[in-house]
């Protein structure tokens, strides 16, 4: 990341980064046939995945974690996650649901 001195410039830089993130949302089977929603493609160097996961878990009333640079949420929340990520400033056009 380029060195940014002005806090306003840093905020604008983060907003531009959010709009350029290609995010993939898909389902994986967990133990005992349960489903989990996987969100990957958010740059963990630029964004606090723990904070994003915390906000998503609160809005979706589900459990989850951050592992290997991706967010894992318990249950199938694909469509809801797309809207919530868009509300957080990520471009809805670049969120791919599988």
UniProtKB/Swiss-Prot annotation:
What keywords are assigned to this protein? Protein biosynthesis, Translation regulation
The lineage's top-level taxon is Archaea
What GO molecular functions are on record for this protein? mRNA binding; translation initiation factor activity
The protein's matches in InterPro entries, at most eight in alphabetical order, are given as:
DENR/SUI1_TIF, SUI1, SUI1_arc, SUI1_arc_bac, SUI1_dom_sf
Q: Look up the record and give one Gene Ontology term from the biological process aspect.
A: regulation of translation
Which PANTHER family does this UniProt record tie to the protein? DENSITY-REGULATED PROTEIN, DENSITY-REGULATED PROTEIN HOMOLOG
Q: What family, per the record? A: Belongs to the SUI1 family.
Q: NCBIfam families recorded for this chain?
A: PRK00939.1 (NF002096), SUI1_rel (TIGR01158)
Query: What is this protein's record name?
Result: Protein translation factor SUI1 homolog
Can you name the source organism?
Answer: Thermococcus onnurineus (strain NA1)
Q: What is the lineage of its organism?
A: Archaea, Methanobacteriati, Methanobacteriota, Thermococci, Thermococcales
């Amino acid at each position: 990341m380029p060195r940014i001195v002005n806090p306003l410039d840093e905020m604008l830089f983060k907003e531009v980064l959010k709009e350029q993130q290609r995010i993939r949302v898909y389902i994986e089977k967990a133990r005992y046939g349960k489903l989990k929603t996987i969100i990957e493609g958010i740059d963990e160097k630029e964004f606090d995945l723990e904070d994003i996961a915390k906000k998503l878990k609160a809005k979706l009333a589900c459990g989850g974690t951050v592992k290997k640079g991706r967010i894992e949420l318990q249950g199938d929340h694909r469509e809801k996650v797309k809207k919530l990520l868009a509300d957080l400033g990520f471009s809805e056009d670049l969120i791919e649901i599988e």
